Amino acid sequence: MMKPVMLSVYGAENVCASCVNMPTAKDTYEWLEAALKRKYPNQPFEMQYIDIHEPPDNEHAKELAEKIRNDEYFYPLVLVEDKIVGEGNPKLKDVYEEMEKHGYTENR
């Protein structure tokens, strides 16, 4: 069995200024999790939500959170493992493509 990939969704409680009328980062986390479970059933993956104002004690997470706060990236910022696959309004297609590079296959 393959090692489950880690998906990270960086965001904040409030919607980013450039992302008005789009889902919040928490909403993005939830719909992304639901979509991935439907597309890749019985293929485990891990997800984490990272608040950009209180990132975990991890240098990589802190650096990304700071870049988002400094407007270098829009949030929600979505990563598969350590690869950025979407920001602001992430596209499922891009997330799926990266998941499939890690061996995930669509349930048919």
Curated annotation (Swiss-Prot):
Keywords associated with the record: Disulfide bond, Redox-active center
Ranges in coiled-coil conformation: none
Keyword Disulfide bond appears in the UniProt entry: yes
Keyword Nucleus: no
Gene3D superfamilies noted in UniProt: Hypothetical protein sa0798
Pfam families in alphabetical order: DUF1462
Disulfide cysteine pairs (residue numbers): 16-19
Protein name: Putative disulfide oxidoreductase YuzD
Annotated source species: Bacillus subtilis (strain 168)
Name of the gene encoding the protein in the UniProt record: yuzD
